[in-house]
Amino acid sequence: MFFCRVYDLYFKIGVVFLNINIDYQSRVPIYEQVVLEIEKMVALGVLNPGDQISSIRDLACELGLNPNTIKKAYDTLEQKGVIISKSTKGTFITDDVAKVKDGKIESIIDEIKEKIQELENIGLDKKEISKRLEL
């Protein structure tokens, strides 16, 4: 296991503490759970543009995870445009929060469309689906 300097976690000024819950029983990979939790915090406005979040090492310590898991999550978030890493300065939420929210909305809509397709595949028509969903 790696060394964790607990005193650093609570005394860093300006760094937003990430309250992330990990479900070890879930089939969703842990790094992906971290990604989803941070995206949710951005979508809900808990994390705002320009907020500095924990470093890879600090978040790994906070969550009791391997730093490589957090690195994979941060790399994914950076590819999605949710965060940006500035060398020697830290990791920050990007200014384009609307893009993140739109991406989350599109993801949910895609899931709903898939479920509607499943209902149609078992014989329900769109009218019946709307009625059951009370739309």
Stretches found by the model and what they are:
Residues 52-63, 77:
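A short alpha-helical element within helix-turn-helix/winged-helix DNA-binding domains
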Residues 58, 93-94, 135:
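Short secondary-structure capping/turn micro-motifs that flank functional sites
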Residues 62, 76-82, 122:
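Residue cluster at the C-terminal edge of the helix-turn-helix DNA-binding motif
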Residues 53, 85-93, 97-98:
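Short, Lys/Arg-rich nucleic-acid/phosphate-binding segment
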Residues 2-52, 106-135:
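Extreme N-terminal segment that seeds HTH/winged-HTH DNA-binding domains in transcriptional regulators
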Residues 98-105:
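Terminal helix-turn-helix DNA-binding modules in bacterial transcription factors
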